[in-house]
Amino acid sequence: MSGDRLEFENPIEDAVSRLRFSPQSNNLLVASWDSYLRLYDVESSSLSLELNSQAALLDCCFENESTSFTSGSDGFIRRYDLNAGTVDTIGRHDDISTSIVYSYEKGEVISTGFDEKIKFWDTRQRESLVFSTDAGGAVGCVTVSGNNLVVCVDASMHIYDLRNLDEAFQSYASQVEVPIRCITSVPYSRGYAVGSVDGRVAVDFPNTSCSSEIKYSFRCHPKSRNGRLDGVCINAIEFSPCGSGTFVTGDNEGYVISWNAKSRRRLNELPRYSNSIASLAFDHTGELLAIASSHTYQDAKEKEEAPQVFIHRL
């Protein structure tokens, strides 16, 4: 295993679902199935906050240094005052809420769920829910980049313009052709990268006229079994914010691999972790990579040992 392991006074008791670094510091959010949202100060190697949420947390995001949000298995969208250590509910989905992101362009929280809804929340308003639209299916993952929101339903990608939400302005089947497990925005371009349940990565630039970097896909985590290549589910994919074109993938067998999207080359593979890679997150400088080694409830063969979070310095 590679990196410094974070120490928690009260161990994380169930699967880690999401890691998120703050946009401007090395504060790290850790959302997990044990109902706790944890805030960890990586610089001082100390736990700053631990808040119970009464439901398994499936995703989290920052608004700023003092405010964050989560989506839960009970459908509720919760807001956390990280300075006061308080939690309140801003609304809910009619089924499990799977994903949550914050749009800095709109100043709104965007959540999705198994109720096939995309919901937009503005906590500055008395009625926080400002818009809701049908996703056309249960949403697996989302990402937001500028004014573009990308919603993944099964193997399809639906792109919305946040300035005009009447309908998706572009919908197409991803190159991976199987259910999409994770998605990330490409920092240096209006594009996206997705990881699939069968170990494929697809990099798409749907709104560019560039010649050579439009779109491509490859099998990123092949494993040889019985004389043939089997794919291993990619649970996490993240681009470095430094604009180098580097991105990392994490799979269900504990491997973290870095790649260069521009040269289409494999760069490095970290020593194998003891459990699945559940989530990855870069800090705002691209110098730190947070890695969650944890079961994910995606594979019956996973080991349900205590989850661990590591910081790898690049």
UniProtKB/Swiss-Prot annotation:
Instruction: Indicate yes or no for the key word Oxidoreductase.
Output: no
What Pfam families does the entry give?
WD40
Q: A GO biological process this protein is involved in?
A: cell division
Q: Which UniProt keywords apply?
A: Cell cycle, Cell division, Centromere, Chromosome, Chromosome partition, Cytoplasm, Cytoskeleton, Kinetochore, Meiosis, Mitosis, Nucleus, Repeat, WD repeat
User: Which residues pair up as cystines?
Assistant: none
**Classification via InterPro entries:** WD40/YVTN_repeat-like_dom_sf, WD40_repeat_CS, WD40_repeat_dom_sf, WD40_rpt
Q: Where in the cell is it found?
A: Nucleus; Chromosome, Centromere, Kinetochore; Cytoplasm, Cytoskeleton, Phragmoplast; Cytoplasm, Cytoskeleton, Spindle
Please give the GO cellular component terms listed in this UniProt entry.
Cul4-RING E3 ubiquitin ligase complex; kinetochore; nucleus; phragmoplast; spindle
Q: Where are the WD repeats?
A: 11-50, 52-90, 92-131, 134-173, 176-215, 229-269, 272-311
* Origin superkingdom: Eukaryota
User: Known SUPFAM superfamilies for this protein?
Assistant: WD40 repeat-like
Task: Establish whether keyword Cell cycle is in the entry.
Answer: yes
Q: Which SMART domains match?
A: WD40 (SM00320)
User: Subunit comment for this entry?
Assistant: Part of the mitotic checkpoint complex (MCC).
* Stated role: Has a dual function in spindle-assembly checkpoint signaling and in promoting the establishment of correct kinetochore-microtubule (K-MT) attachments. Promotes the formation of stable end-on bipolar attachments. Necessary for kinetochore localization of BUB1. The BUB1/BUB3 complex plays a role in the inhibition of anaphase-promoting complex or cyclosome (APC/C) when spindle-assembly checkpoint is activated and inhibits the ubiquitin ligase activity of APC/C by phosphorylating its activator CDC20.
The text of the family note is:
Belongs to the WD repeat BUB3 family.
> Under which name does UniProt file this protein?
Mitotic checkpoint protein BUB3.3
Q: Which species is the source of this protein? A: Arabidopsis thaliana
